[in-house]
Design a protein with these regions (language model features):
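Extracellular repeat-rich scaffold modules on cell surfaces
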Residues: 30-32, 213-230, 247-248, 252-264
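Short secondary-structure transition motifs
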Residues: 44, 77, 89-92, 96-105, ...
Length: 313
């Protein structure tokens, strides 16, 4: 670190013979002025940063001095414009409470997409409208509207091109039912409000899809078991305690999760996949291995900036 205690260099083990090294420098105000990533001898990323008098980021440049992205702000200090090197400009609009109400993406050829949102008096989102233009200038508009109950819980979603979704809740504010068209999913919980089971009944076919959830003592989800042969009216809790056996033909949709002492997901097992995860001291996920193939996640603070696969390391 430097004299002010800011991190100037961070090293992460990639492979047995190769490290990832992140280097930082800072200006007199403590703002990050440069950031670089090296994997072994290979420089993967090198950026420099500029700020305005209020220490707001206004420019990011690459190692050649070319502008990668620039930012502008409104009188309230909110981001009003983002200009990318590829020519895409994004403008942002806000209401009197500084909530995002509009976003427009455009290139030199015109608007490519736009988004708007409105809010209820209590701050909950009432409606969203998105419009996307294709290369011929034809626009596709989609809307989403939301309805809430007196406790602020969402009770209905209405979206363009899909069936409405409605929700009900139990006395503990857990979701009790979700209905999409002719398909209703009911949820069961234990006394700690942890999800135990879902029953999805297709009213047109009377088919009942069941997912059973197994949790550890900390409330982490250890496993999900898919069972379609359980009748909808079955209340036998022995179904909930069903053993999970990977590879069992009856239970081939199982998912089994393992956690460490910090309740971080460290391993997920399915019939076809074995996925493991690693974390740093801040709790950020630093690595993922899928069936033996490793991917390393590179962070700048809390922002993921790069993923390096085994082949790219």
């Amino acid at each position: 670190g430097d004299v002010s205690g800011q991190v100037t260099k961070e090293t992460t083990k990639l492979t047995k013979n190769k490290d990832v090294v992140k280097n930082y420098t800072y200006d007199s105000n403590g703002n990050k002025s440069t950031f670089s990533i090296k994997a072994g001898e290979d420089t993967k990323l090198s950026l420099s940063y500029e700020y305005d008098g209020s220490s707001r980021l206004i420019s990011v440049k690459d190692s050649e001095g070319n502008q990668a992205v620039s930012y502008a702000y409104d009188t309230e200090g909110s981001l009003s414009e983002r200009q990318a090197a590829n020519g895409l400009k994004t403008t942002y609009g806000y209401d009197y409470q500084n909530r995002l109400t509009s976003m427009t993406n455009e290139t030199g050829k015109g608007v490519v997409s736009k988004y708007s949102s409105t809010y209820l008096k209590n701050g909950q989102k009432a409606e969203e409208v998105s419009t996307v233009m294709d290369k011929n200038g034809k626009s596709t508009k989609k809307t989403a509207a939301y309805t809430y109950d007196m406790l602020g819980r969402i009770t209905r979603e209405t979206k363009t091109g899909r069936e409405d979704i409605s929700y009900t809740y139990d006395a503990n504010n857990n979701r009790k039912q979700m209905t999409i068209g002719n398909k209703t999913t009911a949820y069961q919980y234990n006394k700690n409000d942890e999800l135990l089971r879902t029953d999805t009944l297709h009213t047109d076919t009377e088919k009942n899809d069941v997912v059973i959830y197994k949790n550890d003592k900390n409330g982490n989800q250890l496993a999900t078991v898919n069972r379609s042969e359980i009748p909808a009216e079955a209340k036998d809790t022995s179904y909930i305690d069903v053993d999970v056996t990977l590879g069992d033909n009856q239970l081939n949709d199982n998912v089994v999760n393992h956690y460490n002492a910090l309740n971080q997901l460290t391993e997920t097992l399915t019939k076809n996949y074995k996925v493991s995860f690693t974390y740093d001291a801040e709790g950020l996920r630093t690595g993922k291995t899928v069936n033996g193939k490793k991917t390393v996640f590179i962070w700048d603070g809390n922002q993921l900036v790069m993923e390096l696969s085994e082949s790219g390391i």
